[in-house]
């Protein structure tokens, strides 16, 4: 006990961690808050599960058009608990989207987007777009028939945009047609660009909530 107390005192002297703890644990919670105000937190938990299970799958997944499908099959059939890791990843992805939708409805119906919380709402909308992008890019990674044709259709949508449409299609596909470059780009987006982007906007979102507090009743 003496040693643990000494360690605590050492950190307290340098970082004043007690003040941080008091700020976190003593934040005022309005009496109107109910279980529906937990939907955003549940979405965060789903993202953390996604991050953990996705990280685990990167040890076995091979982002090539010739090995992607076989590596996923290997994960599902030969790796210990691989089927469970991938299944949890898929289930938590669906749960994350559902919780996000419900969270958006709750915020909108209770007026949580109004002044002075406009920027909090904007960061939330950006995170919703990133979440959809997660779904689109992740759907293609097994590179089966469903994934391939989903990528071909989705990456071809920007072609309808005047002037820059063809450029955006080529940018997404990494060339004129869907192939290895497309899979590499979608894999990079799904495992690096989107997670870090979402983490940054989550941090901004939470800091604004901490600063402004929970919105009042409608």
Swiss-Prot record:
InterPro entries xrefs: Cyt_b/b6_N, Cyt_B6_PetB, Cytb/b6-like_sf, Cytochrome_b_N_euk/bac, Di-haem_cyt_TM
Gene3D superfamilies referenced in this protein's UniProt entry, alphabetically: Cytochrome Bc1 Complex, Chain C
Binding site for heme b 1: 103, 205
HAMAP family attached to this UniProt entry: Cytb6_f_cytb6
Cofactors (names): heme b; heme c
Species name: Prochlorococcus marinus (strain MIT 9215)
SUPFAM superfamilies for the chain: Transmembrane di-heme cytochromes
Membrane topology (UniProt): Multi-pass membrane protein
Keyword Iron tagged: yes
Localization (cell): Cellular thylakoid membrane
GO CC entries: plasma membrane-derived thylakoid membrane
Cross-referenced NCBIfam families: PRK03735.1
Function: Component of the cytochrome b6-f complex, which mediates electron transfer between photosystem II (PSII) and photosystem I (PSI), cyclic electron flow around PSI, and state transitions.
GO biological process, one term: photosynthesis
GO molecular function: electron transporter, transferring electrons within cytochrome b6/f complex of photosystem II activity; metal ion binding; oxidoreductase activity
UniProt cross-references to Pfam families, sorted A to Z: Cytochrome_B (PF00033)
Assigned protein family: Belongs to the cytochrome b family. PetB subfamily.
Assembly and binders: The 4 large subunits of the cytochrome b6-f complex are cytochrome b6, subunit IV (17 kDa polypeptide, PetD), cytochrome f and the Rieske protein, while the 4 small subunits are PetG, PetL, PetM and PetN. The complex functions as a dimer.
PANTHER family per UniProt: CYTOCHROME B
Keyword match Amino-acid biosynthesis: no
Descriptive protein name: Cytochrome b6
Keyword entries, A-Z: Electron transport, Heme, Iron, Membrane, Metal-binding, Photosynthesis, Thylakoid, Transmembrane, Transmembrane helix, Transport
Chain segments annotated as transmembrane: 35-55, 93-113, 119-139, 189-209
């Amino acid at each position: 006990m003496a040693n643990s107390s000494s360690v605590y005192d050492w950190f307290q002297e340098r970082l004043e961690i007690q003040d941080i703890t008091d700020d976190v644990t003593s934040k005022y919670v309005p009496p109107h808050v109910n279980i529906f105000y937990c939907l955003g937190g549940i979405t965060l938990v789903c993202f953390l599960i996604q991050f953990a299970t996705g990280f685990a799958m990167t040890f076995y997944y091979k982002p090539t058009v010739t090995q992607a499908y076989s590596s996923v099959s290997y994960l599902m059939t030969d790796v210990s608990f691989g089927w469970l890791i991938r299944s949890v990843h898929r289930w938590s992805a669906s749960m994350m989207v559902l919780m996000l939708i419900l969270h958006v409805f709750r915020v909108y119906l209770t007026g949580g987007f109004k002044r002075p919380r406009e920027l909090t709402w904007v960061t939330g909308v950006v995170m919703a777009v990133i979440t959809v992008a997660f779904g689109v890019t992740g759907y293609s990674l097994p590179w089966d028939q469903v994934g391939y044709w989903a990528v071909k259709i989705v990456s071809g949508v920007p072609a309808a945009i005047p002037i820059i449409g063809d450029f955006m299609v080529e940018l997404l596909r990494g060339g004129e047609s869907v192939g290895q470059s497309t899979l590499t780009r979608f894999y990079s987006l799904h495992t690096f660009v989107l997670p870090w982007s979402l983490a940054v906007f989550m941090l901004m979102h939470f800091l604004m909530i901490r600063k402004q507090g929970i919105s009042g009743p409608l």
